[in-house]
Amino acid sequence: MAKSKAYRAAAEKIDPAKAYTASEAVELARETGSSKFDSTVEVALKLGVDPRKADQMVRGTVILPHGTGKTARVIVFATGPAAEAAIAAGADEVGGDELIEKVAGGYTSFDSAVSTPELMGKVGRLGKVLGPRGLMPNPKTGTVTPDVARAVSDIKGGKIEFRVDKHANVHFVVGKASFSPEQLSENVGAALEEIVRLKPSSSKGRYVQKATVSTTFGPGIPVDVNSI
């Protein structure tokens, strides 16, 4: 597949033989982002874990200090006072059986889903719709909780989820190209700190084996893992 002229121009600014520090990489990502729109800045890590082993599954959340640059659409499965609290917290859509049926019909125009524990028996049946998209509420990520209002506030405030895939890679968003270098660096630092904190005790050898920073449709910028 041929690369675009803009991609090639961006790639020419990157020294493939160099491993950049995290701060250098985000600065370069800002420079190589698209001039036509505010590119999303992403980080990809290769971890020294075996995701096939249950005790080496790295999964968690972190609230980025400067948010993601995007206002997340959040739906909440809740009724009664919990539903009222979710609405007050700014949830985009709240409901019980009707919302569950809507999602069962294929509705997925949202970025995150939260549920009260009481409704998870019904929400759990939405696995075929929500599971492949990474949208299924989960206690481990704080999206199955009695305090749905706080969950909504956290997500709207820049909370991101990350999860190692079957190839031991982790991808996550750290902001927009319009962010300052300091904002991006602090977001990257917060995410990396949490991922490193979650290193499985059974993982041996180097934990973060490879790291790259990139923008939407942009080339990957190699990061020196020793700077992480």
UniProtKB/Swiss-Prot annotation:
Binds directly to 23S rRNA. The L1 stalk is quite mobile in the ribosome, and is involved in E site tRNA release. The keyword tRNA-binding applies. Transmembrane segments: none annotated. PROSITE patterns: RIBOSOMAL_L1. Belongs to the universal ribosomal protein uL1 family. This is Large ribosomal subunit protein uL1. Coiled coil: none annotated. It comes from Clavibacter michiganensis subsp. michiganensis (strain NCPPB 382). HAMAP family: Ribosomal_uL1_B (MF_01318_B). The gene is rplA.
